[in-house]
Amino acid sequence: SLEMGRSELATRLMAITSGFPVVELEQGPSFKQDTFERARRQLDAIRELSGGHVLVNRRPLSKLSDLIACIKYYHEVHGSKYVVVDYLQLAWTANSQSIHDRIELVAHQLRDLTHSLGITLVALSQFNRQTSAARSERPTAQGLMGGSAVENDSHQVLLFDHSRFTRMGHTADTWLILDKNRHGGVVDIPVKWDFQNLRISPRSPTIEEQEQQHGRLTRVGRMR
């Protein structure tokens, strides 16, 4: 991560895997030792069952060269095959005249690195200011900060749809937009976001959502 520390990432991972509220796992007034221990045991059980490990950089990274060196190290020493970068816009490069040039360089070099190492990389990205401000409009891959460089160097682009975000208590219904897919078609995936444990899970679309996509439904068929 180029943004969060190890403890922040650890508590978020524990919340997602256990389903417990993240506020009960982080140090603060809502912290609960019993919840923390239960979440830790669940994460340990998953690790023992799967044999997998989540490795996080020990010190903050900012330079692209340090990011590349970190990925190479984890691949060569620990055999890592799946890498998540949080997030692209924080990677710093010298001699870049604009944010577009910087993101283009970062995206190109990370793409070349993943090809040479044979690994999968998930790169998190921000939207640009125009897309972030247009909360009622459906986002597109072209709205990622830095222009089309991120889209061009990606096999798939998944977007969190803020235009169809409906909050209900500590959860919200929205959609993941598969806006680019070199391996097949594009699709909108209905999901539920849980603010307490940070989980995103699939859900069934409501009748109203189905009608918006496919036309009005009746008992005997569909009306256009």
Per-segment meaning from a language model:
Residues S1-G79, T93, I189-K192, P202:
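Cytosolic-facing regulatory segments adjacent to core modules
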Residues Q33-D34, D101, L105, R224:
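Acidic, glycine-rich A-domain
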Residues R38, R102-H214:
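Phosphate-binding/switch region of NTP-binding enzymes
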Residues Y82:
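Hydrophobic "anchor" residues on beta-strands that sit immediately upstream
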Residues L88:
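Conserved Walker B
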Residues W92-I99:
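Conserved ATPase-coupling elements of RecA-like P-loop NTPase cores
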